[in-house]
Amino acid sequence: MKTSRLPIAIQQAVMRGLREKLAQANLKLGRNYPEPKLSYTQRGTSAGTAWLESYEIRLNPVLLLENSEAFIEEVVPHELAHLLVWKHFGRVAPHGKEWKWMMESVLGVPARRTHQFELQSVRRNTFPYRCKCQEHQLTVRRHNRVVRGEAVYRCVHCGEQLVAK
Protein backbone atom coordinates (compact mmCIF):
# COMPACT_ATOMS: atom_id res chain seq x y z
CA MET A 1 0.00 0.00 0.00
CA LYS A 2 1.78 3.11 -1.24
CA THR A 3 0.48 6.04 0.78
CA SER A 4 3.61 8.15 1.21
CA ARG A 5 2.05 11.21 -0.46
CA LEU A 6 -1.09 11.02 1.65
CA PRO A 7 -0.78 12.79 5.02
CA ILE A 8 -1.38 10.57 8.02
CA ALA A 9 -4.03 13.02 9.30
CA ILE A 10 -6.12 12.41 6.17
CA GLN A 11 -5.69 8.64 6.46
CA GLN A 12 -6.80 8.84 10.09
CA ALA A 13 -9.82 10.97 9.15
CA VAL A 14 -10.81 8.42 6.49
CA MET A 15 -10.48 5.56 8.98
CA ARG A 16 -12.47 7.48 11.59
CA GLY A 17 -15.25 8.17 9.05
CA LEU A 18 -15.27 4.53 7.94
CA ARG A 19 -15.46 3.24 11.51
CA GLU A 20 -18.26 5.68 12.44
CA LYS A 21 -20.40 4.64 9.46
CA LEU A 22 -19.68 0.94 10.06
CA ALA A 23 -20.67 1.26 13.73
CA GLN A 24 -23.84 3.11 12.71
CA ALA A 25 -24.71 0.36 10.20
CA ASN A 26 -23.98 -2.45 12.66
CA LEU A 27 -26.21 -0.78 15.25
CA LYS A 28 -29.11 -0.21 12.83
CA LEU A 29 -28.81 -3.66 11.25
CA GLY A 30 -28.24 -5.51 14.52
CA ARG A 31 -25.11 -7.09 13.07
CA ASN A 32 -21.38 -7.06 13.70
CA TYR A 33 -19.92 -6.71 10.22
CA PRO A 34 -16.11 -6.55 10.25
CA GLU A 35 -14.03 -3.56 9.27
CA PRO A 36 -13.06 -3.79 5.60
CA LYS A 37 -9.49 -3.57 4.37
CA LEU A 38 -8.70 -0.04 3.18
CA SER A 39 -6.13 0.83 0.55
CA TYR A 40 -5.21 3.92 -1.45
CA THR A 41 -4.51 2.24 -4.78
CA GLN A 42 -7.44 3.36 -6.96
CA ARG A 43 -6.26 5.12 -10.09
CA GLY A 44 -7.84 7.12 -12.88
CA THR A 45 -11.06 9.07 -12.52
CA SER A 46 -12.80 6.64 -10.14
CA ALA A 47 -12.96 7.99 -6.60
CA GLY A 48 -13.13 4.53 -5.13
CA THR A 49 -14.13 0.92 -5.64
CA ALA A 50 -15.50 -1.80 -3.40
CA TRP A 51 -14.01 -5.26 -3.90
CA LEU A 52 -16.59 -7.70 -2.60
CA GLU A 53 -14.70 -10.99 -2.37
CA SER A 54 -11.65 -9.44 -0.69
CA TYR A 55 -13.90 -7.15 1.40
CA GLU A 56 -11.77 -4.16 0.51
CA ILE A 57 -12.28 -0.49 -0.27
CA ARG A 58 -9.78 1.10 -2.64
CA LEU A 59 -9.63 4.88 -2.66
CA ASN A 60 -8.05 7.28 -5.13
CA PRO A 61 -5.33 9.12 -3.16
CA VAL A 62 -5.13 12.05 -5.61
CA LEU A 63 -8.86 12.79 -5.50
CA LEU A 64 -8.89 12.21 -1.73
CA LEU A 65 -6.13 14.75 -1.21
CA GLU A 66 -7.96 17.33 -3.34
CA ASN A 67 -11.45 16.72 -1.87
CA SER A 68 -10.85 15.36 1.64
CA GLU A 69 -14.03 16.45 3.40
CA ALA A 70 -16.48 15.54 0.62
CA PHE A 71 -14.57 12.32 0.02
CA ILE A 72 -14.96 11.19 3.63
CA GLU A 73 -18.63 12.21 3.74
CA GLU A 74 -19.64 10.72 0.37
CA VAL A 75 -17.16 8.29 -1.20
CA VAL A 76 -16.25 6.28 1.90
CA PRO A 77 -19.93 5.59 2.80
CA HIS A 78 -20.70 4.89 -0.88
CA GLU A 79 -18.09 2.13 -1.08
CA LEU A 80 -18.89 0.84 2.41
CA ALA A 81 -22.55 0.54 1.37
CA HIS A 82 -21.54 -1.77 -1.49
CA LEU A 83 -19.74 -4.08 0.93
CA LEU A 84 -22.55 -4.02 3.49
CA VAL A 85 -25.18 -4.73 0.82
CA TRP A 86 -23.11 -7.69 -0.38
CA LYS A 87 -22.81 -9.04 3.19
CA HIS A 88 -26.48 -8.38 3.99
CA PHE A 89 -28.26 -9.29 0.74
CA GLY A 90 -25.73 -11.21 -1.34
CA ARG A 91 -25.02 -10.30 -4.96
CA VAL A 92 -27.53 -7.69 -6.17
CA ALA A 93 -27.51 -4.75 -8.60
CA PRO A 94 -24.58 -2.41 -7.73
CA HIS A 95 -26.70 0.73 -7.33
CA GLY A 96 -30.06 -0.94 -6.91
CA LYS A 97 -32.78 -0.52 -4.30
CA GLU A 98 -30.78 -2.38 -1.62
CA TRP A 99 -27.78 -0.08 -2.07
CA LYS A 100 -30.00 3.01 -2.08
CA TRP A 101 -31.69 1.82 1.11
CA MET A 102 -28.32 1.13 2.74
CA MET A 103 -27.05 4.60 1.82
CA GLU A 104 -30.10 6.60 2.84
CA SER A 105 -31.84 4.64 5.60
CA VAL A 106 -28.87 2.97 7.28
CA LEU A 107 -25.87 5.25 6.66
CA GLY A 108 -27.84 8.51 6.38
CA VAL A 109 -26.06 9.67 3.23
CA PRO A 110 -27.69 10.78 -0.05
CA ALA A 111 -27.51 7.94 -2.59
CA ARG A 112 -25.48 9.32 -5.49
CA ARG A 113 -23.94 6.98 -8.05
CA THR A 114 -21.16 9.30 -9.22
CA HIS A 115 -18.94 11.96 -7.74
CA GLN A 116 -18.64 15.56 -8.96
CA PHE A 117 -14.95 16.10 -8.24
CA GLU A 118 -12.70 18.06 -10.58
CA LEU A 119 -10.75 15.50 -12.59
CA GLN A 120 -8.07 17.60 -14.26
CA SER A 121 -5.26 16.25 -12.08
CA VAL A 122 -6.13 12.59 -12.71
CA ARG A 123 -7.23 12.76 -16.31
CA ARG A 124 -4.67 11.52 -18.81
CA ASN A 125 -4.46 12.47 -22.47
CA THR A 126 -7.82 13.06 -24.07
CA PHE A 127 -8.89 13.45 -27.67
CA PRO A 128 -11.32 16.15 -28.86
CA TYR A 129 -14.54 14.97 -30.52
CA ARG A 130 -17.54 16.99 -31.70
CA CYS A 131 -21.26 16.61 -32.10
CA LYS A 132 -23.94 19.17 -33.06
CA CYS A 133 -24.07 20.83 -29.67
CA GLN A 134 -20.63 20.69 -28.02
CA GLU A 135 -17.08 19.40 -27.84
CA HIS A 136 -16.30 16.20 -25.95
CA GLN A 137 -13.03 14.80 -24.59
CA LEU A 138 -12.62 11.06 -25.09
CA THR A 139 -10.10 9.07 -23.11
CA VAL A 140 -7.27 7.25 -24.85
CA ARG A 141 -9.11 3.95 -24.38
CA ARG A 142 -12.34 5.22 -25.96
CA HIS A 143 -10.48 7.00 -28.76
CA ASN A 144 -8.63 3.77 -29.61
CA ARG A 145 -11.91 1.83 -29.68
CA VAL A 146 -13.28 4.35 -32.18
CA VAL A 147 -10.12 4.13 -34.31
CA ARG A 148 -10.29 0.31 -34.35
CA GLY A 149 -13.99 0.42 -35.25
CA GLU A 150 -14.99 -1.32 -32.02
CA ALA A 151 -17.18 1.45 -30.64
CA VAL A 152 -19.34 4.41 -31.59
CA TYR A 153 -20.08 7.10 -29.01
CA ARG A 154 -23.06 9.45 -29.04
CA CYS A 155 -23.77 12.71 -27.26
CA VAL A 156 -26.14 12.27 -24.34
CA HIS A 157 -27.72 15.66 -25.12
CA CYS A 158 -28.32 15.68 -28.89
CA GLY A 159 -27.85 11.97 -29.66
CA GLU A 160 -25.48 12.62 -32.56
CA GLN A 161 -22.49 10.37 -33.15
CA LEU A 162 -19.23 11.88 -31.90
CA VAL A 163 -16.69 12.64 -34.61
CA ALA A 164 -12.96 13.26 -34.13
CA LYS A 165 -12.10 16.94 -34.51
Curated annotation (Swiss-Prot):
Cellular component, GO annotation: cytoplasm
Record SMART domains: SprT (SM00731)
GO molecular function terms listed in the Swiss-Prot or TrEMBL record: zinc ion binding
Domain called SprT-like: residue spans: 20-163
Cofactor(s), names only, from the UniProt record: Zn(2+)
Pfam families tied to this protein: SprT-like, Zn_ribbon_SprT
InterPro entries cross-referenced by the UniProt entry: SprT-like_domain, SprT_Zn_ribbon, Uncharacterised_SprT
Keyword Signal: no
Cofactor annotation remark: Binds 1 zinc ion.
A single BP term in Gene Ontology: response to stress
Keyword list, A-Z: Cytoplasm, Metal-binding, Zinc
Keyword Cytoplasm on entry: yes
Catalytic site: E79
Family: Belongs to the SprT family.
Descriptive protein name: Protein SprT
Lineage, top ranks: Bacteria, Pseudomonadati, Pseudomonadota, Gammaproteobacteria, Enterobacterales
Gene that specifies this protein: sprT
